[in-house]
């Protein structure tokens, strides 16, 4: 099928130029006559790849030199455990800001390793979900760290401002909005993100960790989750997912070649504005997130009728608009418009939404 647009929440759409490059090199990488999947992860060419990937990602995201970039396995869920094992070893407790499913899931996992205080910071006003607090400077320093998820993929709730935690360590699960816009990395102790939405394919998680937070893991921390061990081993204490790492490196190069984070931010804002502007004009579809907390990456909407929603998803799929079904815990529809989604994809979705409305209103 031609002109297919993939709105999946993850694994998500990859940049077409990256897929084409990977296809071209699949059987003969770096003139070696073998695939990148077959070469030694400690060989000359792959070591050059990871060095360049670190450099490119650091340039793209303006990551300070006093931060390490780790390319690990286990996804964000693995980091739900790794974070407390590496950080919660002084005061013995952590604060988790709850804005939805993934922040709550992270808090639940952390309770296996430390005391957790969980604070719900969303509320419903006039049927809309909004974040009601971002200043925690009065309580944050009693904790080893403060954790939050700035973009809840399921509901489409996003925190657009960095929470104020004073001098406490701020940790962010940015799996679904990393590299969506410019960010002051220095405000964070740790940022982690599964690659499968904005950075590459599934199979790798990127952890940006401030160097002074490395080296404090509890004794029982498995080496695979120990940031010091991984940093000292170039993220390779075991054989890494080399093909996923390679694809991430291609994504970084593609972003740099096409304007970097400035261009990404402008295009993402344009795509989100197009879709939300339409949702605000129609009475057929509804978005239930307050405007100031609407996600730029995950746009949720519903007709209010489950059968009509199912019909929408089925017909959209036939029209080449894939993976628009909402998460099972939230329902409705969800359009994930990550970095690789072109403006044309959003325009095609809006055109279909208008057609469906005209036929079913």
From Swiss-Prot:
Pathway: Amino-acid biosynthesis; L-serine biosynthesis; L-serine from 3-phospho-D-glycerate: step 2/3; Cofactor biosynthesis; pyridoxine 5'-phosphate biosynthesis; pyridoxine 5'-phosphate from D-erythrose 4-phosphate: step 3/5. GO terms for cellular component: cytoplasm. GO terms for molecular function: O-phospho-L-serine:2-oxoglutarate aminotransferase activity; pyridoxal phosphate binding. InterPro entries: Aminotrans_V_dom (IPR000192), Pser_aminoTfrase (IPR022278), PyrdxlP-dep_Trfase (IPR015424), PyrdxlP-dep_Trfase_major (IPR015421), PyrdxlP-dep_Trfase_small (IPR015422). L-glutamate binds at residue 42. Pyridoxal 5'-phosphate binds at residues 76-77, 102, 153, 173, 196, 238-239. GO terms for biological process: L-serine biosynthetic process; pyridoxine biosynthetic process. The keyword Glycosyltransferase does not apply. It comes from the Bacteria. It holds the Pfam family Aminotran_5. Homodimer. NCBIfam families: PRK05355.1 (NF003764), serC_1 (TIGR01364). This is Phosphoserine aminotransferase. It comes from Mannheimia succiniciproducens (strain KCTC 0769BP / MBEL55E). The lineage of its organism: Bacteria, Pseudomonadati, Pseudomonadota, Gammaproteobacteria, Pasteurellales. The gene is serC.
